[in-house]
């Protein structure tokens, strides 16, 4: 069976598209930087996911590109990466900050010369400003003290927000695997198991069925921990009357979709049932009202107003969708302040989170924007609805 992945030629297409956008902004070159945990921008162009060290891709307006890695990753990057030219820069070293006294590294000057960005008065764009570490920024400034360094993350949002057919295939495959993992975790849930034991069940299933890694640190939270919008699973023992929040994910060639739903160990009652059902209602409303051609702030504004009208404003945490792709949460978000239009093949997680007095709840799935609605990549929530295990 052929593995679902991004073909090599698509990486070259991405670099070519980026180079045109770099030139159109009047830049000489764009640098994107990634870490092990937030690998997306460098991997988007190179297929390379760093370990311990940082990685970067430098793209010139000329169309040439070079993969930049730390001192221990030269062979690793050449074996895994999709960019032929690899340079080793000390600025991309790991956080232990080794001196590497015997190393003769490449330099930023060599990298910029390679992509055709020569001279001193360069215009350099940072395509991933948030991920850019201080040693890398200082290295740029020391090498090019006369350069104009600006943020051009809008280039990366423009490239990554609309997915190709190969990207959509990776996302679909991830959801197929997450459905299998969710089934097995629900079957394994019982009073007395720990949150981390259930994470172990999910990890086994995703690897057995073709995932390269977790798409996110998988969530199995119980009772008070379900109030956490983001968190980590623990050794906490799950009780027979607990509400358990699942958010499971599988990574396919970097693409990281997730499914989230609450599970009642006993029976859904009282405030818990009311809030969980309201959360599901808002989740379904969001899905039904998304389509290409509408302003991205329309749904969030209506979403927030519906919370207010229903008396749940105090339970509102954030609004209804965030971009998804190589990172489970990526730009753009849909917020009340958003100022872009929804376009076909933008992909989002419909992420509906509500916080109660002693618990929280999330219903979550992935969709692609289409002309007259959305393509949903899982029907798991529709098929199973509110799960009560009856312990």
Where are these regions (language model features)?
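Active-site neighborhoods and metal-handling regions in enzymes and metal-associated proteins
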Residues: 1-391
């Amino acid at each position: 069976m052929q593995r679902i992945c991004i073909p090599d030629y698509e990486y070259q297409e991405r670099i070519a598209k980026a180079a045109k956008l770099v030139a159109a902004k009047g830049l000489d070159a764009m640098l994107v930087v990634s870490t092990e945990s937030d690998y997306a921008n460098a991997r988007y162009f190179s297929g390379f996911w760093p370990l311990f060290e940082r990685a970067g891709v430098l793209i010139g307006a000329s169309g040439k590109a070079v993969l930049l890695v730390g001192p221990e990753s030269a062979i690793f990057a050449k074996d895994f990466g999709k960019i032929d030219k690899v340079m080793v820069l000390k600025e991309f070293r790991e956080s232990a900050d080794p001196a590497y006294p015997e190393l003769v590294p490449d330099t930023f000057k060599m990298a910029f010369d390679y992509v055709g960005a020569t001279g001193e008065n360069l215009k350099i764009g940072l395509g991933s400003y948030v991920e850019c570490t201080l040693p890398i920024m200082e290295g740029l400034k020391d090498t090019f003290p006369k350069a104009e360094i600006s943020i051009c993350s809008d280039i990366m949002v423009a490239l990554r927000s609309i997915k190709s057919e190969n990207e959509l295939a990776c996302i679909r495959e991830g959801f197929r695997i997450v459905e299998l993992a969710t089934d097995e975790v629900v079957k394994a849930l019982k009073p007395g198991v720990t949150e981390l034991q259930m994470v172990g069940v999910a990890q086994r299933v995703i690897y057995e069925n073709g995932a390269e890694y977790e798409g996110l640190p998988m969530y199995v939270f119980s009772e008070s921990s379900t109030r956490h919008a983001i968190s980590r699973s623990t050794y906490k023992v799950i009780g027979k009357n607990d509400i358990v929040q699942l958010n499971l994910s599988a990574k396919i060639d970097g693409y990281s979709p997730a499914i989230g739903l609450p599970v009642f160990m006993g029976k859904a009652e009282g405030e818990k049932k009311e809030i969980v059902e309201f959360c599901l209602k808002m989740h379904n409303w969001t899905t039904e009202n998304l389509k290409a051609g509408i302003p991205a702030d329309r749904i969030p504004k209506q979403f927030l107003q519906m919370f207010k009208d229903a008396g749940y404003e105090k339970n509102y945490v954030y609004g209804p969708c965030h971009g998804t792709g190589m990172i489970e949460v990526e730009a753009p978000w849909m917020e009340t302040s958003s100022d872009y239009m929804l376009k076909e093949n933008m992909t989002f997680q419909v992420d509906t989170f509500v916080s109660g007095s002693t618990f929280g709840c999330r219903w979550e799935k992935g969709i692609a924007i289409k002309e007259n609605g959305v393509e949903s990549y899982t029907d798991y929530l529709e098929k199973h609805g509110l799960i009560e295990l009856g312990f």
